[in-house]
Design a protein with these regions (language model features):
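Internal glycine-rich alpha/beta core junctions
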Residues: 1-133
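Glycine-rich cofactor/substrate-binding loops
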Residues: 101-176
């Protein structure tokens, strides 16, 4: 849901809005919309400028929502693996032993996914801090979003791949 919404918000061609309130260059915005693969044109150039940073925030919210789900799922796995519950287990290849309790299997993979996903969820707060006192138009501060967004997309993709690999190795205790 959130990822689809973020995609729709971002699938509008802002080309021609320039750094502030439009451009004096003759530009066929319908043509560039089609050629750049956008679904539609962002008609109001002032709206494009007012939305600077907001489109990135929509992606951050979508990724954060996915990270929240993955973090909670990982936390549940860690909880269900506790000695008190012992509902599930995983093979040695994705767990580690404890230095003081060698028989114990630590769910490191899921603990690290949980931690990484919690960091990803903080992205929206970082974005809000960057843009809180900016006026309309372009500001160099906004370029700080790009690296953070790319890093978070890579991180959530890696978390999903590792989670998918690991969850397929789950052993569910029978007769609980």
């Amino acid at each position: 849901f959130y990822l689809n919404t973020a995609f729709k918000i971002n699938d509008q061609n802002p080309l021609g809005s320039a750094a502030g309130y439009g451009s004096s260059f003759k530009l066929d915005r319908d043509f560039t919309t089609k050629e750049l693969g956008f679904n539609e044109l962002k008609y109001n150039v002032i709206s494009s400028q007012m939305n600077r940073g907001k489109v990135e925030k929509s992606v951050a919210i979508a990724i954060g929502s996915l990270a929240s789900t993955l973090s909670k799922f990982s936390a549940d796995i860690c909880f269900y693996m506790t000695q008190e519950l012992n509902f599930i287990s995983f093979p040695d290849e994705i767990t580690t032993g404890s230095s003081i309790m060698p028989h114990k299997k630590n769910p490191d993979v899921f603990e690290l996914i949980r931690g990484k996903c919690n960091i990803i969820q903080s992205l929206i707060s970082e974005f809000n801090s960057i843009s809180i006192n900016l006026t309309s138009g372009y500001h160099r501060d906004l370029q700080l979003y790009k690296g953070k967004i790319i890093e978070s997309i890579i991180d959530i993709k890696n978390c999903l791949e590792i989670f998918n690999y690991s969850i397929n190795k789950i052993n569910i205790r029978k007769n609980i």
